Amino acid sequence: PARQLDLPPCKSRRADAFITVKGEQTDMKDVKVLIGNYGSGKSELALNFAMQAAARGDRTELIDLDMVNTYFRLTERGKLVAQKEIRLISPNFACSGIETLSLPAEVASAFALDWDSVIFDVGGDDVGATALGRYHRDFAALPEGALEVLNVVNIRRPLASTLEKVLHLQEGMQTHARLRITGMINNTN
């Protein structure tokens, strides 16, 4: 039998609807992908973006695809996320002490279900970005303007301390994720 999804209630709908080619009106999904080097602050930013979206009344899904950094997981913030009515999807076995993680099937719900805002927290290098590449066709099917892929940069991190290093990391992440980075966030502290 099909597994029942526990979806947060929809408090309000966003006003930025668009018309499809067939003339049907549908809500525009806001999808943010935060990608960047290990220790750049992606997970905290992803959490903050999700909390802002939920505060607006958006049905919000937060997806932890960070398969690289097992030291900080969004799963550890599960209680806070649940209080804000944000649906959190984390790698299988996250926070269990098992080092080999796998992606849950629920990640596909970001594309199949009617979420207003979906935020992806993606691994800290080109290897971590490979997990995202599995969904490149789903991202390509999103309406124009619905997707932002943001490279989070902290120049205090050794692998991102120069422009050349940042651009080298970005090139590898774009290649492995099969997505073009559309903007950068300077998260240097």
Task: Describe the predicted segments one by one.
Residues 92-95, 117-131:
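Switch II (G3) loop of P-loop NTPases
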Residues 42:
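Conserved lysine of the Walker
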Residues 126-189:
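Conserved catalytic-core segment of NTP-binding enzymes
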Residues 52-106:
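N-terminal phosphate/diphosphate-binding loop that engages ATP/GTP or pyrophosphate donors
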Residues 45:
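Hydrophobic positions on the alpha1 helix immediately C-terminal to the Walker A/P-loop
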